[in-house]
Amino acid sequence: MDNQSKHLIDIVEYVDNQKPKVKKNIEIVKADPDYPYMLHGSVNGNIKEFVPRLAERPGPKEDKTVPRVHVSDSVIGCVEGMNELVWYLMYGYNAYGSNEKVDFKNGWYIYKLPFEYCLKPNEELVYDMGLSNEHWLVPYNKETKKYKGEIIAKLIVSEVKYQNTGIDDGKRSKVIYEYLLEIMSDKVKITPDNEPYLPGYYKITYFARLGIKTSDNYNPSTYTPEMCQVERISQSEYNGVKKRISPDLFTNLGFIDKLKKSFTW
């Protein structure tokens, strides 16, 4: 039996041992040979290994029984899965309830985690699955008790806008995030619907809440291509923003003195 076949047998057995609700609402996913890893965003740039564990801050109706590493196939998926980066910038690192001692440098490290097989829950187990495309790396055998991680990109927030579009014609207020992304090595999917992007510098404009007229088939819990715009930028433009206080929008809140410094990564 080859190693891949053994992994498949092991993860099938692992799923069979889960609770009925999990078994009914989970899918086994095999790694794509052209993109054999998932992504995980963190303010901690010193993670060597990721250990599957129960969710510490589960969302509404999120599964609380399966130990896992929360991952997604794209940067936007990671952001939707847990937008801790904007939260930290607005309210301070410790306000999020983390006990980790991390030198927060005002940005997110994007890790790649290679895998053979993983699990894909549906909305019954992860309520924001339609936006995050969350996957789980689970401990289904001895080789998957830990997953190795490698930093391949860095993400910073350059601007956040709230735009009131009114209440006529079913419009929704816009929340617009502007991120800058440095892809350092390998290729990275920025959005769930596009091909991976090569190393370089990118500006991401993300309309987290669409300011559009809603229609009968519009689902605010599902990602659509109109929500994201990606533009390649120069290294000098990226560095120019990185050296500023990030972002200026948040510096008047008064209780995030940690942010009053330049980027150091």
Language-model-detected regions and their locations in the chain:
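NAD-dependent ADP-ribosyltransferases
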Residues: 2-265
